[in-house]
Amino acid sequence: IDGYKRIAALEQLGRDTVDAVVWPLSEAAAILLDRSLRFSEPETALEVGWLLAELQQRFGYGLEELARRFDRSVSWVWRRLALVEVLPEAIQEQVRQGQIAAQVAMKFLAPVARQSLEDCRRMADIFAQRRAEVREAGQLYAAWRQGSRAVRKRLLEAPELFFKTQRQQSQPAPAGLLR
């Protein structure tokens, strides 16, 4: 399962044999064991989503089984699967490059993608351009979700107007205007 770095190092040392330990595990169990034994940086939400999708598709694991094996909730599994199953590749790439936070993609873009891929792409571009934080992205998503088709279109065509209005509403009124 994991050993390509060790093999490359042994080749550089001129070794043509490798000592190995074979554990009697299924491929799925070996993949999960390999993940649990890693000491490197934690995987990104997308990488976890790809792994979950692989385990679901190739090995037939259901959401509950994946949640149990990862010691997480079904909702956690479902959100990460949504990243790779629902979001278009271009948006996954924006998440991969750090232009869009994975949490923003999971919480807001995945639900939009289920309703409209075009709106999802436009919203993703807005989030990427603004480097939107979760709170700001949530405000736009909530307005989009509550709006009619015409309101949704205006939100995505002129997001700056929406964000300007949000900033104005969040600022306290000047003291002289209070009664």
Kindly give the residue locations of the regions a language model identified.
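Amphipathic alpha-helical extensions and coiled-coil-like segments
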Residues: 49, 53-61, 79-179
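Amphipathic, charge-rich alpha-helical segments that serve as recognition/docking helices
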Residues: 8-87, 92
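Short, conserved phosphate/pyrophosphate- and ester-handling motifs at nucleotide-, phospho-/glycolipid
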Residues: 3
